[in-house]
Amino acid sequence: MGIEGVLKKGFITTSADTVLNYMRTGSLWPVTFGLACCAVEMMHAGMARYDLDRFGIIFRPSPRQADLMIVAGTLTNKMASALRRVYDQLAEPRWVLSMGSCANGGGYYHYSYSVVRGADRVVPVDVYVPGCPPTAEALIYGLIQLQQKIKRTSTIARDE
């Protein structure tokens, strides 16, 4: 957990940032924004073989209950406003994981008139998972990378 020191008589000292970030990494609640074939791999990662529950990742049905949005698949111009609305409804602090080459940069349909060339043109993306479609293992690796990123963030502002 990042305990900085153990004092005599059973006292443990640590920073509030370390404790808060530890709790946040163990309770990521994603809302799915599955748009194409990448969503099948996302569902696969949530099933019994890979079991995302062991990482504290539990899929939520509503964006108001979630703090992570997984964008999986081809994002079209028509869906861009819906993606932004879902992002705005996420609880703070919120994170976005872009899954698959279509969500990362348009993918195979990059030159189509109706495709947004990456989810990062609509919402800020924290982690990119490459692949077409990425495997469930790649998604889990991306989620672990997001947990590492959350551990490094500073939650409480300090005057230095």
UniProtKB/Swiss-Prot annotation:
Disulphide connectivity of cysteines: none
Cofactor binding mode and count: Binds 1 [4Fe-4S] cluster.
Question: PROSITE patterns under this entry?
Answer: COMPLEX1_20K
Any one Gene Ontology biological process term? Answer: aerobic respiration
**Cofactor or coenzyme needed:** [4Fe-4S] cluster
UniProt entry keywords in alphabetical sequence: 4Fe-4S, Cell inner membrane, Cell membrane, Iron, Iron-sulfur, Membrane, Metal-binding, NAD, Quinone, Translocase, Transport, Ubiquinone
| Location in or out of the cell | Cell inner membrane
The UniProt entry's GO CC annotations, sorted and at most eight, read: plasma membrane; respiratory chain complex I
Annotated residues that bind [4Fe-4S] cluster are located at C37, C38, C102, C132
Spell out the InterPro entries in the cross-references.
NADH_UbQ_OxRdtase-like_20kDa, NADH_UQ_OxRdtase_20Kd_su
Looking up Gene3D superfamilies in the UniProt record yields: 3.40.50.12280
Pfam families the UniProt entry points to:
Oxidored_q6 (PF01058)
- Top-level enzyme category: translocase
Enzyme Commission numbers on file: 7.1.1.-
Catalytic reaction annotation: a quinone + NADH + 5 H(+)(in) = a quinol + NAD(+) + 4 H(+)(out)
User: Which GO MF term does the entry hold, naming one?
Assistant: quinone binding
Q: How does it assemble?
A: NDH-1 is composed of 14 different subunits. Subunits NuoB, C, D, E, F, and G constitute the peripheral sector of the complex.
> NCBIfam families recorded for this chain?
nuoB_fam, PRK06411.1
Which protein family is named in the record? Belongs to the complex I 20 kDa subunit family.
Q: What does this protein do?
A: NDH-1 shuttles electrons from NADH, via FMN and iron-sulfur (Fe-S) centers, to quinones in the respiratory chain. Couples the redox reaction to proton translocation (for every two electrons transferred, four hydrogen ions are translocated across the cytoplasmic membrane), and thus conserves the redox energy in a proton gradient.
What this protein is called in its record is NADH-quinone oxidoreductase subunit B
